[in-house]
Amino acid sequence: MKVTKETHFGIQRKIVANMTSESWETIPHISYIYEPEVSKFLDVVKELNASGKFPVKITVNTIMLKALAEAFKAAPCLNAHIEFNRKLVRGKISEFDEIHVSMTWILPNGEMMTLNLHDIGNKNLVELTEYIADVGRRIGNTDLNEVMFSVSMHDTIKKLKKGKIIQVLQRLIGSKTGKHKVRTLKGEEKKAYYSIPEHDRLTKKDIEQGTVTISNLGSIHRNQKGMCFLLEIIPPQVTAIAVNAIQKKPVVVYL
């Protein structure tokens, strides 16, 4: 067979591929599908925006995030990380008081990456809307390869501290040599980039692991038909939720 195109992984795809493969290798997945009738939900969204009580437009995505945050407060075991050592047969589950959501975001170039939306459980609808808008603003000032390389190096150091020396060496060889070398900023270009205040660009804190994953597929594929029924859980998280596109279809309504 003749190869028609060959694309080497950039750092973003390397990180996603690494986390996804680790997910399927280490986590037994199960899925549950709930398909609500959302006509009244959408009516509430319209009523909130027509009320004049909010200085900004409240989106379906914002209210969905707020609703899920309240659900995690009611079921804190889902907002957790798990650790398990198979060799020593030791493990623990750590529940968190704050809800940090790893959420897929569409970038200006059309690519997607996962960002960490911090502490959404303690934000009201206006604060959450303004926070999401600010994240979008900071993306425009961010060199994503640079910030993701920072996250990758931080994760590599953590693995080194855990004694995973061979894995660390393999990762360094893969990212620093040959055709697969990760390209980062150099010289004056790097100096100019890091002169941008951290509150005006994304940092490692905005990319690192959250406590739970939510992927709003409906905002990415608005004309989607069918649904996603299994989303990979990113370790050490224990929960991943996929929100599908709103679809018109006949349903049975129980009065």
Regions found by a protein language model. Name each.
Residues 1-255:
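C-terminal catalytic/motor cores of large multi-domain enzyme assemblies
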